[in-house]
Amino acid sequence: LRDLPELLDAVCGYYKRRFHVEITPDQVASCAGSQEGVGHIGMVLCDEGDTVLLPTPCYPVFIAGSLLGGAKPWYYPLTKEHGFLPYVKDIPEDVARKAKYMIVSLPANPVGSVGSPELYAELVAFAKKYDILIIHDNAYSDIIFDGAVGNSFFNTPGAMDVGVEFFSLSKSFNVT
């Protein structure tokens, strides 16, 4: 089963216009929704007993997806002290070494925090250091307030080497 070339081209065009990110059709895959992709990626990436890094609070499908893959979630807290953003310095080195992937959801629902270029650069460096895949849930990039701007993880140098990004048509375009 292949995606329609017109759909892939439209996604590439949208990413260029909206996020100023150049991607090619071979870097795009459609799912029946970003929830499906995030919920099933653990079955592809994980073996029984692997560790995955999940935010808390988080969308329940993040947990279910990791468990479907046989992985053990390790929860990193999103605290007020750090602006409800991932703070990789609090992830113990022994945990980071075992992790297959880390899910990052920015802009974050329900807290509304938005990632900065500096944070994304830290995540890229963390992923490279520990050979971890960053799974960026970008479903809410167009639903933010107070003048904030949602962005793509792929705007960060090196992010395409260590990341997968999920974008949702249902949130931005009410397409389900």
Regions found by a protein language model. Give the residues of each.
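N-terminal small-domain helix-loop-helix segment of the aminotransferase-like
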Residues: 1-35, 40, 90
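Short acidic capping loops at alpha-helix termini that bridge into adjacent secondary structure
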Residues: 22-28, 48-51, 98, 160-163
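Conserved coil-to-alpha-helix start sites within the AMP-binding
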Residues: 34-38, 58-62, 173
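Conserved PLP-anchoring active-site segment centered on the Schiff-base-forming lysine
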Residues: 44-66
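Active-site phosphate-binding strand-loop segment of PLP-dependent enzymes
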Residues: 79-147, 151-154
